[in-house]
Amino acid sequence: VSNADLLDAEQAGVDVEDGRVIVDEYQRTSARGVFALGDVSSPYLLKHVANHEARVVQHNLLCDWEDTQSMIVTDHRYVPAAVFTDPQIAAVGLTENQAVAKGLDISVKIQDYGDVAYGWAMEDTSGIVKLITERGSGRLLGAHIMGYQASSLIQPLIQAMSFGLTAAEMARGQYWIHPALPEVVENALLGLR
């Protein structure tokens, strides 16, 4: 939990709201020359988010404060999360309920690990991949995985969302190694209508 409210940051001209240092998309604070990143300023209390923000700050520190054309922005569109339990849980993007609440016309596919050769060989009866896409455009809206190596299996889905690949492009635009567990992602993609 951020403790920015305890830093007395206002003394340096740094604005704080709800216990967090306020930053813009370049990670700049309200005080000229002062950047912030990680738990002190981000609503995402995740190390990989802080790593991303650190790369943004590292680049932007070398730019003139007003030269936003040379700066890079922090991209928080598709922040993934993983829980390293047994089984692992990983997620990125919208849940089915969130997509419905936004009034989106969606397609949902739940694929069991045991439906692919690797999952069958592991005798996996609980692992699943759940994908949510926008019907019509095929745009991936969310991915949720529970099972062995969920934190690794979700990575290509994060990439697809970040780079704007549709479910069909991702499913058919590359080779999927057989027999390997990522085939469960391929089959989920192919099962979307």
Model-assigned labels for residue ranges:
Residues 43-51, 59-98:
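Rossmann-like dinucleotide-binding cores of NAD(P)H-dependent redox enzymes
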Residues 24-28, 51-52, 64-70, 138-140, ...:
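Short C-terminal domain-edge/linker segments immediately following a structured domain
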Residues 3-8, 72-75, 112:
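Alpha-helix initiation/capping motif
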